Amino acid sequence: MTQGRQKEELQDITLLGNQNNKYEFDYTPEVLETFDNKHQGRDYFVKFNCPEFTSLCPITGQPDFATIYISYIPNIKMVESKSLKLYLFSFRNHGDFHEDCMNIIMNDLIDLMDPHYIEVWGKFTPRGGISIDPYTNYGRPNSKYEKMAEHRLMNHDLYPEKIDNR
């Protein structure tokens, strides 16, 4: 039988359960928090579905809306979900292209957690009659996860007509 988490394991978690969180409207990666993965010997996916992502077009300043899917195979650290929510909210006034936002998010999460594998997929609502759905991924170099990343990238979105994201 496994035990729940001990208080000393949770001492770095400051946002979850805190009713006085400040919502930053400008890009704030330092809000991200982690906790230890208690199942380090096992490969498993953690997936976040984030349907309320907003950023700004760097040219027009108009808002862009997306659902973001973040999936990763943790190593030692895992991202805490409320800190991720506040982090994603901090893109609200961030002016960047869709592709840049997805790569920034992935890079920040790699720097934070050092996962075995991670992928970030943004499904943006159409503007000007065109939707943009950037997908980016990473697998730890010189490991089976690097090969996995290459395989998933090459096979990503093979049947886009089956994807209903609007």
Swiss-Prot record:
Gene Ontology CC annotations of this record: cytoplasm
Compartment(s): Cytoplasm
Coiled-coil portions: none
GO molecular function, one term: preQ1 synthase activity
Alphabetized InterPro entries for the sequence: GTP-CH-I_C/QueF, NADPH_dep_7-cyano-7-deazaG_red, QueF, QueF_type1
Active site: C57 (thioimide intermediate), D64 (proton donor)
GO biological process terms on file: queuosine biosynthetic process; tRNA modification
Enzyme Commission number(s) from the entry: 1.7.1.13
Biochemical pathway: tRNA modification; tRNA-queuosine biosynthesis
Top-level EC class: oxidoreductase
Record function comment: Catalyzes the NADPH-dependent reduction of 7-cyano-7-deazaguanine (preQ0) to 7-aminomethyl-7-deazaguanine (preQ1).
Family named by the database record: Belongs to the GTP cyclohydrolase I family. QueF type 1 subfamily.
Name the UniProt record assigns to this protein: NADPH-dependent 7-cyano-7-deazaguanine reductase
Protein species of origin: Staphylococcus haemolyticus (strain JCSC1435)
Gene, per the UniProt record: queF
